[in-house]
């Protein structure tokens, strides 16, 4: 399944979500998150930007990104949602968060952006302002080796300046992809808390 809503659950504030995978591809951990969101009534799409390729090794994942190039990755992200309705929440893990950030900022109708271990500088994505109708939620491990406070702060300033809501949640762990059960950085407590906070954001 890639976008079904499971029967019997119909919350009044059900959202339609696009969940982008990380540099490691559409791993089981991403699909598990999608299923959990479906179980509480949301409709979730999980585009595969790698055409089936999945990685467990960091260097192999980095090589894949280098092979594609960031512009191509973002182009694939935009193409993946082109056939969908406009009123969507965009979410993603790591590189997938950057994809979610781009699409949420540039595709009219976005209802929110959930960036897990992810934000990029707005100027690097080619625009100066953030849409006033698109709230943002950012999640990071406190000791994530890829965390850049200046980038997070700059995004917060731009989003708040637009009038949109901005939430930042930090977690007492040191890994990057701490929500993927099959990755060395997995932290079950932090992953569950992040999921709970995402669910609350989707209610707003």
Question: Whereabouts are the PLM-identified features?
Answer:
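Gly/Ala-rich beta-loop-alpha elbow adjacent to hydrolase catalytic centers
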Residues: 92-96, 100
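A conserved short beta-strand
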Residues: 109-119
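Short beta-strand/loop motif that positions the catalytic acidic residue
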Residues: 132, 138-140
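C-terminal catalytic histidine-bearing segment of alpha/beta-hydrolase fold enzymes
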Residues: 165-204
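Serine-hydrolase catalytic machinery in alpha/beta-hydrolase-like enzymes
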Residues: 1-85, 178-179
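Acidic catalytic loop of the alpha/beta-hydrolase fold
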Residues: 143-148
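Short beta-strand immediately N-terminal to the catalytic nucleophile in serine-hydrolase-like folds
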Residues: 90-92, 116
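Active-site signature of alpha/beta-hydrolase-fold catalytic machinery across serine-
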Residues: 32, 102-106
């Amino acid at each position: 399944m890639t976008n079904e809503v499971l029967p019997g659950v119909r919350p009044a504030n059900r959202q339609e979500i696009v969940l982008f995978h990380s540099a490691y591809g559409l791993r089981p951990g991403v699909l598990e998150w999608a299923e959990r969101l479906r179980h509480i009534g949301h409709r979730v799409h999980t585009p595969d930007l790698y055409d089936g390729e999945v990685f467990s090794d960091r260097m192999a994942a980095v090589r894949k990104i280098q092979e594609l190039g960031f512009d191509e990755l973002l182009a694939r992200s935009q193409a993946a949602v082109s056939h969908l309705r406009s009123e969507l929440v965009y979410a993603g893990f790591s590189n997938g968060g950057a994809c979610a950030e781009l699409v949420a900022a540039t595709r009219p109708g976005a209802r929110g952006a959930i960036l897990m271990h992810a934000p990029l500088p707005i100027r690097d994505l080619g625009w100066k302002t953030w849409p006033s109708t698109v709230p943002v939620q950012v999640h990071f491990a406190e000791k994530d080796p890829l965390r850049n406070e200046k980038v997070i702060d700059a995004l917060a300033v731009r989003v708040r300046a637009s009038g949109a809501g901005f939430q930042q949640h930090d977690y007492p762990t040191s890994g990057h992809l701490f929500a993927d059960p099959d990755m060395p950085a997995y932290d079950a407590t932090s992953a569950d808390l992040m999921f709970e906070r995402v669910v609350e954001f989707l209610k707003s």
